[in-house]
Amino acid sequence: MANKYYPTIGLEIHAELKTQTKMFCACKNDSDEEKPNVNICPVCMAHPGALPVINKKAIENVIKVGLAVNGTIADFSEFDRKNYFYPDIPKGYQISQYKFPIVSGGHLADMDITRIHLEEDTANNKHDRGKYALIDFNRSGVPLMELVTEPHTFESVEVATKTATNFAKEFQLILWYLGASEANMEKGEMRVEANVSVSTDKNTKSKNYVEIKNLNSFRSVEKAVKYEIERMTELLKDGKEKEIVRETRGWDEGKQKTFSQRKKEGSADYRYFPDPDLPKLKLHEAFDLGKMKEELPELPEAKRTRYRNCFGIKNEDIEVYINDKVLSAWFEEVADLLKVPEKVKLASNYITTDYLGLKKTNLDIRCPSVENFAELINLIFENKISSRTAKDILAMMVKNDASPMKIAQEKNLLQKNDEETLKPIIEKIIKENSEAVVSYKGGKENAIMSLVGKIIKESNGSANPQIVIKLLKEMLE
């Protein structure tokens, strides 16, 4: 019987924290600064005698994240020196946390969390100057939070990649909702590393795992994890398990494959020891954790549940709102005005399809006022305008936010519901389309819809389709 292969995934996610200053000095924390080496000082440049001072806001942000994922906040924490030599670390060591992280445990999006700790970011190496490599120290010393998950074993590559990607997406949302980080992956404010191994025994994890470094998009996470699982699986199938070694690998976006970078270091290689220049952290004394827990904002999963229960809208629509706090706030105000569940659902459909469709083609369009948008939905429900006309009116509203009723009146778009007004138009179309009439009378029910379309066109879109169908059937009997 053929072996079954079980992938095991663990994630490490780094996120630059949203603070005014760096982790251990008063230099500005500004990821948008384009001029190199301006936000630097003796502390983040490791000048002799320059001593670090802990950024309390950074610790507060990590605690908030820990509370949001139901982690345990440590009574005691401390910073350690992680010793290694690399040009982007001027001190020869990185200030990090090893034995005593700020947060232990927790759970999010089907994955258990091992720990969340705080460290300083490294400088930014520039390798685009030919034979020279340049270093920008603006990022050096920026507060960097690292989340580490437990390794999780999965039944298939599809489940593994989906779970890993969903976790990263959900964690980014948590950071946004808490205001802890901008977590912009394109700018390197959130970086994902995936530890991957494959085994033929579901209960035994392979010791030879690889770490895929610095994945800077969710698509890269999905593609890199999938590729690496499949690469390892093929080696195992071919009896080449010795070629699977514990190493660090990169992801080549162009070639869509991982590549070997270096042998994977162990914690002993870094010779961690407590930083003698920094005090121990007594977190339960320094922070009111109960109050911080109470003051957490509504988080994504709670918001999903509320939207399902209160509005009954589609899951796809809910995810649109979860990922756009401004849009969701606008929708909630519209829903509060409309109140009727059917109207709220219709409003959501127009927002997530028609309004966002318009915005996709023109980023500069205006968001209609809550009152005007609610009025548009009411006009549809009152049969004063058709759904097609509503789309046209909305396209005008995003330009000047005029009243939809005013637009409908000025453009003669109000729906004609008066049967006596519609009958002459219907009679005209019946006379001009004898073939469709014969087809309908011959049993082809769909033939009536071509007549309906012509009648609505003849009325410049103002004829009520339901009334048109009713009258047509009566007049063709």
Give residue ranges: language-model regions:
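Strongly charged, low-complexity linkers/loops
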Residues: 364-378, 387-457
